[in-house]
């Protein structure tokens, strides 16, 4: 079979001439030359495009990495600020509680002092009222005694006796006033 195919190709070659006279041959040669000549610049262009794309991707990755680091730093900063704010808030609350306790104790002391002062004022008023009541009772007793004495003296003493009693009372008055 090979011999039959070879013979057919040989007959075909003899009828058409040598292989380099065939247009298919020259198309194939031209294609191979174009591909061979274009391969180096095209491969360089493709390599350059791939390198540029690779550099661009690397740049974006570096930028993304940098942004991620910045975001982590910002997160850490905000977390630190939040912790500081929470600590400060706790300190403020503790201070406010201590201040409230101090104010409550002070208010209790002030209330106690005020109550004692009011109690003392009430006791003073009671003592004044008592003293005034005693004076009024004494004055009333003196008035009653004077009235009774006048009545008794007026009924039992004569005018001469009354005059001598008044004179004696006036003489004794400076000694009794001191």
Curated annotation (Swiss-Prot):
It is found in: Cell inner membrane. Keywords: ATP synthesis, Cell inner membrane, Cell membrane, CF(0), Hydrogen ion transport, Ion transport, Membrane, Transmembrane, Transmembrane helix, Transport. The keyword Transmembrane helix applies. GO terms for cellular component: plasma membrane; proton-transporting ATP synthase complex. InterPro entries: ATP_synth_b/b'su_bac/chlpt, ATP_synthase_B_chain. The keyword Electron transport does not apply. One of its GO terms (molecular function) is proton-transporting ATP synthase activity, rotational mechanism. It comes from the Bacteria. It holds the Pfam family ATP-synt_B. The chain crosses the membrane at residues 29-50. Disulfide bonds: none annotated. It is a single-pass membrane protein. CDD domains: ATP-synt_Fo_b (cd06503). F(1)F(0) ATP synthase produces ATP from ADP in the presence of a proton or sodium gradient. F-type ATPases consist of two structural domains, F(1) containing the extramembraneous catalytic core and F(0) containing the membrane proton channel, linked together by a central stalk and a peripheral stalk. During catalysis, ATP synthesis in the catalytic domain of F(1) is coupled via a rotary mechanism of the central stalk subunits to proton translocation. PANTHER family: ATP SYNTHASE SUBUNIT B, ATP SYNTHASE SUBUNIT B', CHLOROPLASTIC. Belongs to the ATPase B chain family. F-type ATPases have 2 components, F(1) - the catalytic core - and F(0) - the membrane proton channel. F(1) has five subunits: alpha(3), beta(3), gamma(1), delta(1), epsilon(1). F(0) has three main subunits: a(1), b(2) and c(10-14). The alpha and beta chains form an alternating ring which encloses part of the gamma chain. F(1) is attached to F(0) by a central stalk formed by the gamma and epsilon chains, while a peripheral stalk is formed by the delta and b chains. This is ATP synthase subunit b.
């Amino acid at each position: 079979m090979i011999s039959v195919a070879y013979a057919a190709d040989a007959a075909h070659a003899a009828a058409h001439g040598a292989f380099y006279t065939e247009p298919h041959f020259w198309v194939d040669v031209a294609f191979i030359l174009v591909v061979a000549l274009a391969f180096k610049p095209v491969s360089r262009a493709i390599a350059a495009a791939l390198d540029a794309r690779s550099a661009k991707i690397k740049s974006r990755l570096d930028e993304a990495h940098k942004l991620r680091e910045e975001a982590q730093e910002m997160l850490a900063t905000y977390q630190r600020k939040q912790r500081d704010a929470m600590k400060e808030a706790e300190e403020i609350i503790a201070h406010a509680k201590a201040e409230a306790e101090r104010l409550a104790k002070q208010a209790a002391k002030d209330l106690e002092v005020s109550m004692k002062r009011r109690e003392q004022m009430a006791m003073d008023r009671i003592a004044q009222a008592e003293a005034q009541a005693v004076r009024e009772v004494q004055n009333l007793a003196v008035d009653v005694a004077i009235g009774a004495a006048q009545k008794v003296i007026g009924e039992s003493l004569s005018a001469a006796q009354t005059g001598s009693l008044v004179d004696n009372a006036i003489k004794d008055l400076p000694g009794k006033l001191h």
